[in-house]
UniProtKB/Swiss-Prot annotation:
Pathway: Nucleotide-sugar biosynthesis; ADP-L-glycero-beta-D-manno-heptose biosynthesis; ADP-L-glycero-beta-D-manno-heptose from D-glycero-beta-D-manno-heptose 7-phosphate: step 1/4; Nucleotide-sugar biosynthesis; ADP-L-glycero-beta-D-manno-heptose biosynthesis; ADP-L-glycero-beta-D-manno-heptose from D-glycero-beta-D-manno-heptose 7-phosphate: step 3/4. ATP binds at residues 208-211. NCBIfam families: cyt_tran_rel, rfaE_dom_I, rfaE_dom_II. Residues 357-486 are annotated as: Cytidylyltransferase. This is Bifunctional protein HldE. PANTHER family: BIFUNCTIONAL PROTEIN HLDE. The gene is hldE. Residues 1-331 are annotated as: Ribokinase.
């Protein structure tokens, strides 16, 4: 496959859904508390965060699994949680992931690792960790090894995601690698610590620059130093390849006789949380779907660049990767999926921007539509337009509508300067889309009343408001269609 062939790369991305990957490693609960800072505490010179929203998601090895499912790949997941509420929360969160076969063992007396990040205006204020690092009991370790070794038979790639919380003790890591090699399975290790001897014979190891420097005991100031260090650990531990992530400098893939440097793909960096997990997941899915190592590494580099441009522990989806390889041109860049719109809204929110939302069929765009959209945009910093899909319009307007198909309606809307994003939705109402975007301002025409605006109660529940825009008399899509037919 030629690296420059966009068509082949897009086919490779679509093929990631064929992957079936085993993930073994440390699972933790990632919590995010978002809010605003408006004053300093009178008790100490520290900011007061007024929390407005909290979310929780699987972290550590669980984030590798999240990224695999975001690619539509299948995953078997083996890990350990404590017998506490956080462990129960993680079990539910992992159980809610599609295409995952979870094997979460519960250990009495173990405290589930929890990392809580406090964020305001897109900036991390502090991270609070609660953890008790301890090895597994011999009995539980043997059980984990048996389950993981059995799961290897149904998967083609095994990922060891080591955060040094006790699941991947040296003996367990060695035995898992030996089991995988005995049946011809590829092993990827995301390492931790300075001693990598228990990762010996892994096919690919994925350190960042700091971790590789720690393993060889010296600074790595440039590409030549990174290549030298990578070949040193390849020679010492028998690795097939080292994929070193280098932050703003991209990634380097090193084998005994080849070197490839991939430049950084990120346009803007908002949050590096979990980016390494994304790289590992895409690499694993690529290899599991039959891609050459060089192409899988290239896709993982693209994916890493995407997630650092998002807020929080984010994932890269196939459509994201396709757009990065072959971006839409012109106004069509504004036509996005619900998930992409929600992620954009979160970035805008962290910058303190007010998000506006309106929706409709916008079948034959007329001056009345333009007037409403301009008022909506004047009442916010960024405007998202929900556009009824063709099926939704037919249910609402009848079998003869829409006149224009959804792709054409979306393209015309996206060409307007007042519109920042367009999202097509299949439902009869935009409630689900509203809940995903959580706008500050919900805009409808003045022919509505507050009580008849769908989503008014929901928007006001999170502190938003409803705006009724004045209408421009004499303009109606229905009237235009009637005139055309007569």
């Amino acid at each position: 496959m030629a690296e420059h062939d966009d068509g082949d790369l897009i086919a490779a991305i679509r093929g990631l859904a064929r992957a079936n990957v085993l993930v073994v490693g440390d699972l933790m609960l990632d919590r995010y508390a978002y809010g605003r800072v408006e004053r300093i505490s009178p008790e100490a010179p520290v900011p007061i965060l007024t929390v407005t929203r909290e979310i929780a998601m699987p972290g550590g090895a669980g984030n590798v699994v999240r990224n695999l499912t975001a690619l539509d790949a299948a995953a078997a997941f083996v890990s350990v949680v404590g017998d506490d509420q956080e462990g129960s929360d993680l079990t539910a969160l992992i159980g809610g992931q599609p295409n995952v076969e979870p094997w979460l063992l519960v250990e009495t007396g173990r405290a589930t690792t929890v990392k809580t990040r406090y964020i305001a205006a897109g900036q991390h204020l502090i991270r609070a960790d609660r953890e008790l690092v301890m090895p597994l009991t011999d009995k539980l370790g043997e059980r984990l090894l048996k389950i993981a070794s059995d799961a290897m038979a149904a998967t083609s790639v095994t990922v060891l995601s080591d955060y040094r919380k006790g699941v991947l003790a040296p003996t367990i890591a060695r035995n898992l690698i030996a089991s995988a090699r005995s049946i011809g399975r590829t092993v990827i290790v995301d390492p931790k610590g300075a001693d990598w001897s228990h990762y010996a014979e892994a096919d690919v190891i994925t350190p960042n620059r700091r971790e590789l420097a720690e393993a060889v005991g010296r600074d790595l100031p440039d590409e030549a130093a990174i290549v030298g260090a990578a070949r040193e650990v390849i020679g010492r531990f028998g690795f097939g390849a080292v994929l070193c992530t280098r932050s703003e400098d991209g990634m380097s893939l090193v084998t005994v006789d080849t070197v490839r440097h991939y430049p950084a793909e990120a346009a803007e960096v908002y949050d590096v949380s979990g980016a390494g997990d994304t790289v590992v997941a895409v690499l694993a899915a690529g290899l599991a779907s039959g891609l050459p190592l060089e192409i899988a590494a290239r896709l993982s580099n693209i994916a890493g660049g995407l997630v650092v441009g998002k807020v929080g522990t984010a994932v890269a989806r196939p459509d994201d990767l396709v757009d990065a390889v072959k971006p839409a041109s012109g106004a069509l860049r504004k036509v996005v999926t619900r998930q992409a719109a929600a992620e954009a809204a979160e970035r805008w929110r962290q910058r303190g921007w007010r998000i506006g939302f309106t929706n409709g069929c916008f079948d034959l765009l007329h001056p009345g539509h333009v007037h409403l959209l301009e008022q909506a945009r004047a009442g916010c910093d960024r405007l998202v337009v929900g556009l009824n899909a063709d099926s939704s319009v037919r249910r609402l307007k009848g079998a003869t509508r829409p006149v224009q198909p959804e792709a054409a309606r979306a393209a015309v809307l996206a060409s307007l300067a007042s519109v920042d994003l367009v999202v097509i939705f299949e439902e009869d109402t935009p409630l689900d889309l509203l809940s995903a975007i959580r706008p500050d301002v919900l805009v409808k025409g003045a022919d509505y009343t507050h009580d008849t605006v769908v989503g008014a109660r929901e928007v006001e529940s999170w502190g938003g408001r409803v705006m009724l825009a004045e209408l421009l008399p004499g303009h109606s899509t229905t009237a235009t269609v009637t005139r055309l037919r007569s």
